[in-house]
Curated annotation (Swiss-Prot):
Keywords: ATP synthesis, CF(0), Chloroplast, Hydrogen ion transport, Ion transport, Membrane, Plastid, Thylakoid, Transmembrane, Transmembrane helix, Transport. The lineage of its organism: Eukaryota, Viridiplantae, Streptophyta, Embryophyta, Tracheophyta. It comes from Dioscorea elephantipes (Elephant's foot yam). F-type ATPases have 2 components, F(1) - the catalytic core - and F(0) - the membrane proton channel. F(1) has five subunits: alpha(3), beta(3), gamma(1), delta(1), epsilon(1). F(0) has four main subunits: a(1), b(1), b'(1) and c(10-14). The alpha and beta chains form an alternating ring which encloses part of the gamma chain. F(1) is attached to F(0) by a central stalk formed by the gamma and epsilon chains, while a peripheral stalk is formed by the delta, b and b' chains. The chain crosses the membrane at residues 7-29. GO terms for molecular function: proton-transporting ATP synthase activity, rotational mechanism. It is a single-pass membrane protein. F(1)F(0) ATP synthase produces ATP from ADP in the presence of a proton or sodium gradient. F-type ATPases consist of two structural domains, F(1) containing the extramembraneous catalytic core and F(0) containing the membrane proton channel, linked together by a central stalk and a peripheral stalk. During catalysis, ATP synthesis in the catalytic domain of F(1) is coupled via a rotary mechanism of the central stalk subunits to proton translocation. This is ATP synthase subunit b, chloroplastic. Its main location: plastid. It is found in: Plastid, Chloroplast thylakoid membrane.
C-alpha cells in the first residue's frame, strides 16, 4: 500500500501543471496515472469493504455449514426414530401374523372337532333310527304272526269244537275260577 501511495506522490510531483484545464491526448502518459490513482483509491477504500464482504461471506458459509450439520443430525435422529418405529411395527406385525396363524389353526381344529361331533351324532341318530325301525318291523312281524296264529288257532278251534266240547270247556274254566276264588278268600 505504501508503494502505491509513493508512486502516486511521485507522479503528482513530476507532472507539469499548466495554468488551465486541458485534455491530455497522450494515451500512454495519462492511462498509467489514471490507473494508478483509481487503483490506489480502490485499494485504500475497497480493502475494508472487501474484507467485510469476505467476512460476511465466510460467516454465511459457516452458518450454512452449521445449519446443514444441525439438519443432518436432526435427520439422522428422525431416521433412527423411524427405523426404531419400523422395527416395532415389524415385530407387532409378526406377532399379529403368528397370533393370526395360531387363531386360524385353533379355529380349524375347533371346526374339525365340531364336524366330527356332528357326524358322530348323525351316526348315532342313524343307528337309533335303524334300531327303532328294526324293532318296529319286528313288532309288526310278531303282531302279524300272532294274529295269523290266533286266526289259525281260532279256525282250528272252531272247526274242532262242537257244542258239547264247548260247554265242557266253559264249565271247566268256571270251575277253575271258582277254585281260585276260594283260595284267595
Amino acid at each position: 500500500m505504501k508503494n502505491v501511495t509513493d508512486s502516486f506522490v511521485y507522479l503528482v510531483g513530476h507532472c507539469p501543471f499548466a495554468g488551465s484545464f486541458a485534455f491530455n491526448t497522450d494515451i500512454l502518459a495519462t492511462n498509467p496515472i489514471n490507473l494508478s490513482i483509481v487503483l490506489g483509491v480502490l485499494i485504500f477504500f475497497g480493502k475494508g469493504v472487501l474484507n467485510d464482504l469476505l467476512d460476511n461471506r465466510k460467516q454465511r458459509i459457516l452458518s450454512t455449514i452449521q445449519n446443514s450439520e444441525e439438519l443432518r443430525k436432526k435427520t439422522i435422529e428422525q431416521l433412527e426414530r423411524a427405523r426404531d418405529r419400523l422395527r416395532k411395527v415389524e415385530i407387532e406385525a409378526d406377532e399379529y401374523r403368528i397370533n393370526g396363524y395360531s387363531e386360524i389353526e385353533r379355529e380349524k381344529t375347533n371346526l374339525i372337532n365340531a364336524t366330527y361331533d356332528s357326524l358322530e351324532r348323525l351316526e348315532n341318530y342313524k343307528n337309533e333310527t335303524l334300531h327303532f325301525e328294526q324293532q318296529r318291523a319286528i313288532n309288526k312281524v310278531r303282531q302279524r304272526v300272532f294274529q295269523e296264529a290266533l286266526q289259525g288257532a281260532l279256525g282250528t278251534l272252531n272247526s274242532c269244537l262242537n257244542s258239547d266240547l264247548h260247554f265242557r270247556t266253559i264249565s271247566a274254566n268256571i270251575g277253575i275260577l271258582g277254585a281260585m276264588e276260594e283260595i284267595t278268600d
